[in-house]
Amino acid sequence: MRNRVKQLRKEAGLRQEDLANLLGVTRQTIIAIENDKYDPTLELAMKLSALLKLHVDEIFYLDQDKEKL
């Protein structure tokens, strides 16, 4: 799964630490998500979606090269 978290965070004027605090996670978690090293839980994805006022599928999407449907 890929994501646009880094781009959207910057557009919102947030630092990684700010976003982490707002979501109740560590900065390291945000770094891992932004670098596609960690897929967030559904709960965390929903919190991020609500915070950014976007649908989850506007933030996260399948990497079609890796995920054959």
List the predicted regions and their residue ranges:
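Key DNA-contact positions within bacterial/archaeal DNA-binding proteins
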Residues: E17, Q28, D57
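DNA major-groove recognition helix of helix-turn-helix/homeodomain DNA-binding modules
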Residues: E43-E58
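Short, conserved catalytic or interaction motifs in soluble domains
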Residues: N35, L54, Q64
